[in-house]
Design a protein with these regions (language model features):
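A structural motif corresponding to the C-terminal end of an alpha-helix
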Residues: 46-67, 91-97, 129-136, 224-225, ...
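Alpha-helical scaffolding within the catalytic cores
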Residues: 52-55, 80-93, 172-183, 213-221
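Active-site and substrate-binding clefts of carbohydrate-active enzymes
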Residues: 2-48, 178-186, 190-191, 205, ...
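N-terminal catalytic cores of secreted or lumenal carbohydrate-active enzymes
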Residues: 1-104
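Metal-dependent polysaccharide deacetylase catalytic core of the NodB/CE4 family, i.e.
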Residues: 67, 73-145, 187-202, 236, ...
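Catalytic domains of cell-wall/extracellular-matrix polysaccharide-remodeling enzymes
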Residues: 115, 121-176, 239-256
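Generic structural signal for well-ordered alpha-helices
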Residues: 53-57, 86-90, 120-130, 153, ...
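An acidic- and aromatic-residue-enriched active-site/binding cleft used to recognize and process polar
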Residues: 8-13, 72-74, 103-108, 143-149, ...
Length: 376
């Protein structure tokens, strides 16, 4: 193996309320539909661990690591509650070996709409926000849930993006391994599922045969895999969580670049990988859809499909109402209603999946009526 790309995602959703329709319809406000107390509590909990975690990532970078950060727009909105959080990420950016990925601003599935206008606007908004906050222009794109759908490559290239990261799903790879820069419309790195989850999910599992996982052990596994680049994709929250559960995660990240370097393996950013390695054509990137943990988690039942279709209609209806579409509160509401987390909550594999579907569709109905009536 020649190299490793490591991308870390930090997304905190705007949770929907359990919604009980009052007499008539409500005035469309964020507080009407979203559980602000829970959102703030979750942010405070994450914020408490960010400074320490980012100091660990800084030490890792000093030892030769490179990271790509995917900070969702919903998380960046919440950072207004504590400017120290953004300053911590600015300090990380100042190390010079951190890239920031672009995504849909509201962590949405807008890439699945037949009309990609809203998708394009959300990606551009996210790119502008990253540039404003950190002084860098993203070149790598990551769809929420590592979603890939074959019609977005052209849009991404027009926005100036040069590559993307997606799920290393079996229906994309067939018999191939996710160890190359793949290409169809746009160069694509595919997440190595097993190695990513060895870090994010199994690291603190004391019943796991490979516990404890050291950097040296992990690097030795990578050394014996043939290929150009392995892409690791982690949830940011898994880093402090694993450290608190069993310890060792912080030391693992500090040591990993050194252990890889001893074996002649470098940690690089996606934009470096696409320049260094020959692209391997993968036709399924244009013909198949895939997402982290499977498309069925997002769109596996009627309620999820219906919610997506209603969103598509609402986005178009709001855009057509210039008197409403320029209202900042309305724009944020329709954005937050598109979060991928809402679809995952309606998965009937969850014990509350049916209840969530009824709840979420009720909120959507209330908001759509507000557009019809011109209520703000």
């Amino acid at each position: 193996m020649e190299s490793v790309c490591m991308c870390v995602e930090l997304h905190l959703p705007y949770h929907l309320k359990w919604y009980w329709p009052a007499d008539g319809y409500r005035r469309p406000e964020i507080s009407s539909y979203f559980d602000q107390e829970r959102i703030f509590t979750d942010f405070q909990h994450m914020a408490a661990s960010i400074s320490r975690t980012n100091k660990v990532l800084t030490r890792s970078i000093e030892n030769g690591a490179a990271y790509t950060l995917n900070l969702s727009g919903t998380f960046l909105d919440q950072c207004s509650w504590d400017p120290r959080v953004l300053n911590s990420f600015r300090d990380l950016a100042d190390t010079g070996n951190v890239a920031f990925a672009a995504s849909t601003y509201y962590h949405s599935l807008s890439a699945l709409y037949p009309d990609l206008t809203d998708f394009k606007e959300q990606v551009w908004t996210h790119m502008e926000k990253i540039s404003e906050l950190f002084g860098v222009v993203p070149s790598t794109f990551v769809n929420p849930e590592l979603l890939t759908s074959g019609n977005i490559g052209g849009v991404l290239k027009k926005l100036g993006l040069t590559c993307m990261i997606a799920e290393g799903a079996r229906n994309l790879l067939n018999t191939d391994m996710p160890v190359s820069v793949f290409s169809d419309d746009i160069p694509t790195l595919l997440r190595h599922i097993d190695l990513s989850e060895d870090i994010s999910k199994r690291f603190s599992d004391k019943s796991w045969d490979d516990h404890p996982l050291t950097a040296d052990k992990f690097a030795s596994w990578i050394e014996h895999i043939e290929g150009d680049v392995i892409t690791l994709y982690l949830d940011y929250g898994s880093i402090p969580w694993n450290e608190s559960k069993a310890g060792g995660m912080f030391q693992f990240l500090k040591d990993l670049p050194l252990s890889l370097e001893e074996r002649g393996i470098s940690m690089i950013r996606p934009e470096d990988a696409i320049k260094r390695f020959e692209k391997v054509k993968l036709d399924t990137l244009k013909t198949e859809s895939a997402a982290r943990y499977g498309m069925e988690g997002l769109l596996g039942n009627h309620a999820q499909h219906f919610y997506l279709k209603q969103l598509e209609i609402i986005v178009q209806e709001l855009a057509a109402r210039t008197d409403l579409s320029e209202n900042g509160e309305m724009k944020k509401i329709v954005g937050y209603l598109q979060q991928s987390d809402i679809f995952l909550d309606m998965n009937t594999a969850n014990i509350t999946g049916y209840e969530k579907a009824v709840n979420n569709l009720s909120i959507l109905s209330d908001f759509r009526r507000a557009i019809w009536e011109g209520r703000t």
